């Protein structure tokens, strides 16, 4: 059956509008899962909803295509829910108000949720169409944005009887994603012995307005890590005078390069100008080491209220040594794909709590052995510094498949349909594909998507001219997967 561009556009946007009407914050997907289940049943598909509210939707092969291998189309139902300043928005009750200006689809003051609502909408639309295809399975997962717990919990049996998986959670229409990085949460803790401050002057040292960014996608941009910078500052001050450290903090998520950090300390010195030398030294260092990419940072040290408690010199030295000696940033580049980071680590957040200082480190690699290796290095470093370090369960990596038939079919079909080449690359960030690969290493997996810009922000917008070609690409690829 031949479909016009308008039919495809209207059909997919209608499916997306259904999703936008249902609040679907991560870990609150029951309503959207129930809606999609009933909708898929209404057009004749078989549906399984697991205890996590993941959906497994099966469509029988078209007549004459029963012997073709099964193809999975996959997306996630949850979305990142954020609103612009001043916008009244409750992620648990408020629908997304869609604005279509003919060029972009966006929301009125909130994130749009095209990540990954548009992937789910495209799959739902294709499940209703008549064309040559083998058995199709749509898998819609929960909680991709916060923990990938849906993909992690998915029963492997839904992956073992398929040959191909098309993930629809990428954001660039002309880019085919071949692999993604795994990761592991490394958590360090120093138990603190508190005492009353002996010094009567207190100061707050702040580094802020560094660039920051995603600790996977932006790790090779060379941005400064604010946590590492303040550890240098503490060392510099310790060389000039005796101090008592009261707190150290940087509160961004572990998958964000810290753009700001601060520490509070006491000193026998009552003249803040003494510390201006350290401020100037840190500024000079940032300009020399990061001046090409860090343009707007500020470094300050100002008097503050005397803290009620400070940590021992041993505790402070242990924490600062661990941060200073921790390897962060790009640790290894790929020897196979030019420009691809193979191993990295990000330090932050750092939190001073009631009885401890907690430090988070987040290593990434598509090679699971490297992720485990760097986690073990942090554990050994912690022992040297008197810091308790534990490593969580690693999220697996998804390595590129050099023999991928699906990759060649996608690249060929894209060129035929669009008249120019699609780029194929790996990313140094996480995708649910990693868990699917771990459950079935023989599954041929790729990831694609239309142009979705400024995701996870109120400026998120979907470029409409890439939507129909994206849907046509999925359909065209499936029509060729006869063996």
Predicted regions and their residues:
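Active-site metal-coordination/substrate-binding segment of hydrolases
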Residues: 65-156, 162-163, 202, 316, ...
